[in-house]
């Protein structure tokens, strides 16, 4: 009995330590993909993306190892009030060797405080670097509303008919502004901070199982005293977004309309661009005529329209389906815009709750505003997959795949040595372009993908 009693304080201490450790447990989340692939004509796996398109169909068409490792913890809680600390470090390498060193990207480091304002119950205030309410199409890895970066804001203010969120974030351009010396020449180039102010109203009930989200983003270049933007720079711009989400067939459909102006048109997702520098080069035509191109990447004046429909649904016990259809038109005053439309489907047939076959078919068509020519690409992937569950979203997954791509490109961006301009040219231009011409290729390999 004496021995048992002597052991009791130790047991209590151990139990208390275990409970304390559980109470302070760190949340571990993340995403990763990696694999190996080959190309039919030889060499490592190639990936296929139409020139001028902002994304590609990703199944069996990813050529890098990428990972995001998220660590977070609720560090304080009292009643319904709490503070949460969140971090995210990301890595990307070419998956060519065992040892591939890279500089990590510190993508998130923020604190979120919930229910801290008595008269705004349910709201969250936050500050730091953050992935902020991102909207994307998973099938093509395309982010159409994403103002992520260092920032601060308040979100989920309950208005009764919807929830209001306000945020300010920053995305900096290298070499975006300059000052003058006494001789009126460029004296010093300085990075330009582009600020974005974001207002969103979400959760607006429109119909049974349907909700609407509305958003306005204003982006502007914020120059340092003593510096000025390059002449003609796109100093600011707006983006307006309306997204309707319909819950259906054990999944969802999202219909999106977006309009952007000037500095908000380049990326078209809510981050300002257009204060960057400029360069020039000369093209010599076959008849000896020389044309000088001023590659003024500072000029994004114009507008962008985007109409997008995408979703993921279940078609019964054995079938799931992802799909996307999008039209995007960037019309710039400098005639360097593009018209891009894409359509694709990814059906999944489930042989068992953990084994499936996937087929992804995607088509891209991109027209150059400058040349009037079009680039197009078909891409088809067949994959056999083993995944942790019977949903098209189930991960981790291990898949083996074969991919075929066929493209016919009539234009490319003009190249001057290793530098690629935003100026477009037909494939028979006097200066080489990065157009891929008319060809096809196939690849095969294996890949893992996981999120948790």
UniProtKB/Swiss-Prot annotation:
Superkingdom, natural source: Bacteria
GO molecular function: maltodextrin transmembrane transporter activity; maltose transporting porin activity
Classification via InterPro entries: G_neg_Bact_CarbUptk_Porin (IPR050286), Maltoporin (IPR023738), Porin_LamB (IPR003192), Porin_LamB_sf (IPR036998)
Entry keyword set: Cell outer membrane, Ion transport, Membrane, Porin, Signal, Sugar transport, Transmembrane, Transmembrane beta strand, Transport
Membrane topology: Multi-pass membrane protein
Signal sequence annotation: 1-25
GO biological process, one term: monoatomic ion transport
Record-annotated site: Important in sugar transport: 143
Pfam families according to UniProt: LamB (PF02264)
Positions marked as site (Greasy slide, important in sugar transport): 31, 66, 99, 252, 393, 451
UniProt cross-references to Gene3D superfamilies, sorted A to Z: Porin, LamB type
Cellular compartment(s): Cell outer membrane
GO cellular component: cell outer membrane; pore complex
Swiss-Prot/TrEMBL catalytic activity: beta-maltose(in) = beta-maltose(out)
Induction: By maltose.
PANTHER family reported in the protein's UniProt record: CRYPTIC OUTER MEMBRANE PORIN BGLH-RELATED (PTHR38762:SF1)
Similarity comment: family membership: Belongs to the porin LamB (TC 1.B.3) family.
Subunit structure: Homotrimer formed of three 18-stranded antiparallel beta-barrels, containing three independent channels.
NCBIfam families linked: PRK09360.1
Function as written in the Swiss-Prot or TrEMBL entry: Involved in the transport of maltose and maltodextrins.
The protein, known as: Maltoporin
Native organism: Salmonella paratyphi B (strain ATCC BAA-1250 / SPB7)
Originating gene: lamB
């Amino acid at each position: 009995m004496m021995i048992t009693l002597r052991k009791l304080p130790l047991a209590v201490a151990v139990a208390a330590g275990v409970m304390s450790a559980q109470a302070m447990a760190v949340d571990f989340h993340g995403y990763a993909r990696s694999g190996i692939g080959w190309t039919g004509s030889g060499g490592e796996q190639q990936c296929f993306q139409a020139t001028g398109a902002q994304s590609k169909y990703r199944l069996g068409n990813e050529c890098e190892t990428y990972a995001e490792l998220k660590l977070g913890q609720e560090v304080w809680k009292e009643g319904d009030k709490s503070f949460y600390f969140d971090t995210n470090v990301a890595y990307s390498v070419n998956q060519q060797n065992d040892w591939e060193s890279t500089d990590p990207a510190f993508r998130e480091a923020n604190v979120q405080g919930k229910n801290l304002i008595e008269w705004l119950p349910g709201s969250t205030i936050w500050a730091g670097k953050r992935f902020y309410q991102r909207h994307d199409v998973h099938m093509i890895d395309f982010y159409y509303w994403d103002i992520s970066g260092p920032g601060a804001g308040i979100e989920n203010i309950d208005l009764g008919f919807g929830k209001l969120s306000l945020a300010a974030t920053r995305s900096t351009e290298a070499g975006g502004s300059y000052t003058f010396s006494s001789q009126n020449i460029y004296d010093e180039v300085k990075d330009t901070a582009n600020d974005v102010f974001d207002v969103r109203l979400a959760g607006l009930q429109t119909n049974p199982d349907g909700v609407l989200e509305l958003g306005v983003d204003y982006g502007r270049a914020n120059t340092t005293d003593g510096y000025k933007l390059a002449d003609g720079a796109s100093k600011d711009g707006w983006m307006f977004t309306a997204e309707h989400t319909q819950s259906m067939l054990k999944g969802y459909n999202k219909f999106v309309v977006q309009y952007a102006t000037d500095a908000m048109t380049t990326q078209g997702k809510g981050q300002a661009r257009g204060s960057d520098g400029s360069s020039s080069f000369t093209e010599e035509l076959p008849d000896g005529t020389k044309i000088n191109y001023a590659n003024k990447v500072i000029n994004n004046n114009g507008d962008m329209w985007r109409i997008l429909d995408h979703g993921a649904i279940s078609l019964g016990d054995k079938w799931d389906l992802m799909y996307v259809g999008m039209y995007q038109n960037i019309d710039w005053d400098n005639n360097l815009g593009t018209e891009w439309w894409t359509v694709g489907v990814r059906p999944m047939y489930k042989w068992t709750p953990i084994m499936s076959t996937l087929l992804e078919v995607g088509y891209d068509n991109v027209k150059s505003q400058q040349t009037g020519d079009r680039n197009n690409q078909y891409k088809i992937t067949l994959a056999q997959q083993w995944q942790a569950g019977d949903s098209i979203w189930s991960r981790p997954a291990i898949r083996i795949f074969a991919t075929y791509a066929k493209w016919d490109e009539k234009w490319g961006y003009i190249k001057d040595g290793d530098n690629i301009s935003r100026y477009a040219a037909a494939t028979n231009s006097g200066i080489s372009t990065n157009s891929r011409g008319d060809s096809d290729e196939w690849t095969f390999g294996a890949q893992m993908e996981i999120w948790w």
